[in-house]
Amino acid sequence: MEGPLRTPPIDRSRELLKTAREEIFKSVNGVDLPVYIWEPEPDKAPPYPKSVAAFFFSSGWDNGQIAQFAPHCVYFASRGMTTMCFDYRVSARHPGSGPLQAMADARSAIRWIRMNAVELGVNPGKIIGVGGSGGGHAIASAAILNGFDDPSDVTDCSPVPNAVVLFNPVMDTWSRHAPYQDRWPDNASRKAADLYRGIKAGFPPMLIMHGTEDRVVPFDGSYTFARKSSKKKNICRFIEFDGKGHGFFNFNLSFEMYEATLMAMDEFFVELGFIEPDPNAGLGKDEAL
């Protein structure tokens, strides 16, 4: 006799996605790419156009879950921001797609926010791009590299985010240690998309977080990028998480690491003037009520 039916575990991130408003930010060959949007409650919203946190899920450009950063979105909406989870093309859902398409979609996403800033009630000069792994490369490339635009984009509108937060990002695409080398259509594009080659002064402020035991995307790629970028007088905060592997920051993997990285982001956003300090920070539950 079979045992009792087991209720499948709830994917909390996917459940949180249902609390967002869905819009279409881009259509490619008849396929719509959605963005999920969270707004702050009226008592949490600032009396001026809001800052935006735009999230791009982790991937190796083959697959990924758009709901991954939904917990982050809910939190930062509670801090007075408009938050968004953007879809972008990966090969599992869009055959033939790869890193170049992801890069183009990230640029399109930032432009979409700027071009619709009035309707969205947001500040087009306070857009933070956030991404992990291949999604981190996509949004970082919008901040660092020229080109890689979608032919349908209005290129007069800047795709450069005003700040960037990266989780175990792919920064190195060209060296022999670079991950996911087989995902590129050719060596020329892999070399052109290498973020090391774009390092110069004038980058938007960045926060990079990476686990030292990452066996998927090498830790040294982020560490070396942060060091070289800082030498160009850019703001490039780097936090290493000793003994942590790939994806250590995810809500469903480790709440402790999720919370630690979330607070690092919060402090970074406050430092940049994108949100106000949390008046309840450091208070116990009863004190914060």
Identify what each model region corresponds to.
Residues 1-48:
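N-terminal cap/lid segment of alpha/beta-hydrolase-fold proteins
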Residues 44-50, 56-96, 137, 215-216:
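Short substrate-entry loop that stabilizes the transition state in hydrolases
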Residues 64-73, 84-124, 252-259:
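Catalytic nucleophile-loop/oxyanion-hole region of alpha/beta-hydrolase
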Residues 173, 213-217:
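Acidic catalytic loop of the alpha/beta-hydrolase fold
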Residues 56-59, 113, 210:
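The conserved beta1-alpha1 loop
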Residues 36, 96, 219, 223-289:
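C-terminal catalytic histidine-bearing segment of alpha/beta-hydrolase fold enzymes
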